[in-house]
Amino acid sequence: DGHRIPISVRTSTLTDTSGSVIGGIELFTDISHQAVSQLRIQELEKMALIDKLTQLPNRHYLEKELLNKFEEKKRLNFPFGILFIDIDHFKKFNDTYGHDVGDRVLACVARTFTANSRPFDIYGRWGGEEFIGILHIATGDDMEHLADRLRMLVENSYIMHEGNRLIVTVSIGATILRDDDTIESLLKRADSLLYKSKQAGRNRYSFGP
């Protein structure tokens, strides 16, 4: 009837008394249940690593990726940097317009990251209104350029609420991995630079090598 099902195929050869191949046997096995189970496992794995609201990698995924990046740096000397990003006045969106609008703000920022990220960079939700970008990058100038570009892209995005355009901005701390860094020291430095941006008035980035 044209219905398709997943199968596994096992093939064996048939030989005569002299050892010559005279044919073959194929054994087909319905593996529908196995396929469904595998899809369920993949979905559960995805749910464990993806933030449901923003559809970005979650904190667990980001922590695993940072470990991978540190290993790559040790083995292959691949440089990278991180952006620590915080949505400005996010509490105000929640308190003034409600949590539904706050969720839309988070989703809007996430879409901006997704639409403008390079294939080899990763942006994820660290928690609350905080995000992290893990960027394959070698120089401070490149890092500053990307940080400011991302800031401007978010600033130029908005959501509509009851006929009003709500502008969203972010503050960013940007830094590049040092030879003596640990994951903790790298994140702490980026977080300190983020705080510097917020203290300086928000909607800006601060870079520190």
Which residues does each PLM region occupy?
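PAS-family sensory domains
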Residues: 20-31
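A short pre-motif secondary-structure segment
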Residues: 122-125, 166
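Catalytic-core segments of nucleotide cyclases and related cyclic-nucleotide turnover enzymes
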Residues: 144, 162, 176-209
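Active-site-proximal structural segments of metal-dependent nucleotidyl cyclase/transferase enzymes
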Residues: 65-97, 113, 124, 143
